[in-house]
Amino acid sequence: MTTDPSVKLKSAKDSLVSSLFELSKAANQTASSIVDFYNAIGDDEEEKIEAFTTLTESLQTLTSGVNHLHGISSELVNPIDDDKDAIIAAPVKAVRRKIERDPNAPKKPLTVFFAYSAYVRQELREDRQKAGLPPLSSTEITQEISKKWKELSDNEKEKWKQAYNVELENYQREKSKYLEAKKNGTLPPASLENGPTHAPVPIPFSLQHAAEPPVEKRPHDDDGSSEKKKKKKKKDKKKDKSNSSI
């Protein structure tokens, strides 16, 4: 086995390049598989939840591996001058121009499952905060949302679907108004303050208007009413006396 440092360095470099190539190839295959898997799911919400849960866990594993790779690469010394010339510069990708969205344009409401997820996520956060418990991780939240959605009855799920349909109809009306105003040139100046900042979250009416606790009467209100009754009785007695004297 050779002990020449330059040979060992070249061998290590070749191994690293080969590993990175395999990693890139695997990432491309994973992305393609995700698209195929998502397209094969269809409209089954429960299967989508399972898919998102699996995807979240896989991405966290991948992120951990990439961070580990980054830590190792940052510790490597710079290559010697002879090897610098052998490194092939990676092609510079053209920067995609970000399409600017008109702030005045209405935002499409979140779909049924994402609206439910947003509602439950906020509910979990508030409940744990009130109980003095630490916040859940992203994976734990996703699993809890999946569990709660599966436990919902068909009737409850239908309420979420109805809420989405209401918001969707409202969005379509607002979109028609927006397109008409844009066509006529009557849109207000583009400003984040004028337009919607977040996509509407369709929530069932029953959850929007939960029963509020009855307002307790203040003690002085009762005292005041009883005091008025006493005064009225005194007046009635005076009237009776005056009538009897006549």
UniProtKB/Swiss-Prot annotation:
One MF annotation (Gene Ontology) recorded for this entry: double-stranded DNA binding
Record's subcellular location: Nucleus, Nucleolus
InterPro entries referenced in this protein's UniProt entry, alphabetically: HMG_box_dom (IPR009071), HMG_box_dom_sf (IPR036910), HMGB (IPR050342)
A Pfam family hit: HMG_box
Region described as Disordered: 179-246
Residue ranges: DNA binding: 106-179
Other noteworthy facts: Present with 19000 molecules/cell in log phase SD medium.
Protein name: High mobility group protein 1
Source organism (scientific name): Saccharomyces cerevisiae (strain ATCC 204508 / S288c) (Baker's yeast)
Taxonomic path: Eukaryota, Fungi, Dikarya, Ascomycota, Saccharomycotina
